[in-house]
């Protein structure tokens, strides 16, 4: 297993995490076998947004004395009034459900402000006692960090700019990133993922990931497989379905991403997902899926790695990623981004201008110029 730090929290998360939703309604032996298989595979980051007591208790029981070995995202405002998943901003209801979660798990590592997708959602959290409750939970140590969940890049950016959150769970996959920000990606998913609205990588979504990386707000990912539609021959919006490895690699190569939450229902599901860890670069490569959309990406690095190997040993995708983040505000490059760049074994200033990378790039990126810009921006060269 590989591990990444979640933003500036100091928490190291397995790049393949576990979303608990698909364990809801399953018998305890199945939950136990699945959870333990995930732990044995090195999974140490779990999302428990489900409000039902039974699934919460089953997961906690399956963790047993290994609770201390994992970090849990628990959602403030997730309820099931009327036996239906629901969102609540009613404080007595919010407290009831979250304090039940605390009783079951003892503490929650990431207290997630649940489902902020609209201005109404934002106001219901940040202009009411809801946010005060979350801050008090952190002050008492009941939660260690404050995060939030969203599917809307515009609203997510607004939340991050409050300065109160340390991580974000966001829906990231190639199809979602091709929808303009004003298109509701969750609605598109529910309606079948039409490709008619695709318009190239949406700049607001790309800027959101870069903003998170620059501010040290870690990202965990939901909807990595698009509810299974991206890997389905019948439902894919692309000319051919993506593979699980391609979906995972796309999400994990976005700036700021620490972990993807996958919905395992069995030990076999866990074993299948872990194949990503030993997959070759060819098996992970998602660029063939773009096919006829390639013109929409002209000149834009998608961090695919086709440019490698570099004779100077430069990790070109990493340099481009840090450069894209720094370009958000070149006069105020975050120290953490500069430090990550400077920690690279080979830097942009070592570019030989041989042009081999540009010959291999499917998207016509001016890699040589990017290396020069990175050298100027980060190294003063």
Which ranges hold each PLM region?
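Acidic (Asp/Glu)-rich catalytic clusters
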Residues: 7-10, 40, 59-71, 101-107, ...
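Active-site mouth loops of central-metabolism enzymes
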Residues: 17-29, 76-93, 123, 232-241
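Iron-sulfur (Fe-S) cluster-binding segments and ferredoxin-like electron-carrier domains
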Residues: 311-328, 359, 363-377
């Amino acid at each position: 297993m590989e591990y990444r730090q979640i933003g500036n929290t100091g928490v190291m998360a397995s790049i393949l995490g576990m979303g608990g939703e698909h364990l809801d309604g399953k018998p305890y032996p199945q939950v136990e076998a699945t959870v333990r298989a995930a732990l044995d595979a090195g999974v140490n980051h779990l999302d428990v947004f489900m409000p039902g007591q039974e699934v919460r208790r089953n997961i906690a029981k399956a963790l047993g004395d290994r609770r201390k070995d994992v970090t849990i995202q628990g959602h403030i405002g997730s309820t099931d009034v009327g036996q239906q998943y629901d969102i609540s901003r009613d404080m007595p209801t919010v407290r009831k459900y979250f304090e039940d979660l605390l009783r079951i798990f003892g503490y929650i590592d990431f207290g997630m402000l649940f489902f902020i997708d609209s201005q109404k959602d934002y106001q219901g959290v940040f202009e009411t006692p809801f946010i005060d409750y979350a801050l008090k939970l952190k002050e008492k140590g009941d939660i260690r960090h404050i995060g939030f969940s969203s599917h809307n890049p515009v609203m997510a950016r607004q939340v991050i700019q409050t300065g109160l959150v340390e991580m974000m769970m966001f829906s990231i996959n190639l199809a979602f990133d091709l929808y303009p920000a004003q298109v509701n990606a969750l609605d598109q998913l529910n309606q079948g993922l039409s490709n008619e609205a695709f318009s190239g990588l949406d700049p607001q979504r790309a800027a959101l990931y870069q903003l998170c990386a620059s501010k040290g707000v870690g990202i965990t990912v939901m909807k990595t497989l698009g509810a299974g539609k991206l890997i389905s021959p019948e439902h894919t919006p692309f000319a051919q379905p993506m593979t699980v490895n391609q979906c995972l690699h796309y999400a994990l190569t976005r700036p700021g991403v620490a972990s993807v939450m996958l919905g395992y229902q069995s030990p076999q599901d866990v074993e299948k997902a872990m194949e990503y860890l030993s997959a070759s670069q060819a098996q992970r490569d998602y660029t063939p899926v773009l096919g006829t959309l390639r013109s929409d990406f002209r000149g834009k690095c998608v961090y695919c790695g086709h440019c490698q190997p570099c004779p100077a040993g430069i990790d070109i995708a990493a340099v481009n990623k840090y450069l894209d983040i720094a370009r958000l505000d070149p006069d105020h490059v975050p120290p953490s981004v500069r430090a990550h760049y400077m920690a690279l074994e080979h830097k942009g200033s070592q570019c030989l201008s041989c042009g081999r990378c540009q010959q291999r790039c499917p998207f016509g990126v001016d890699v040589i110029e990017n290396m020069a810009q990175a050298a100027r921006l980060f190294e003063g060269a």
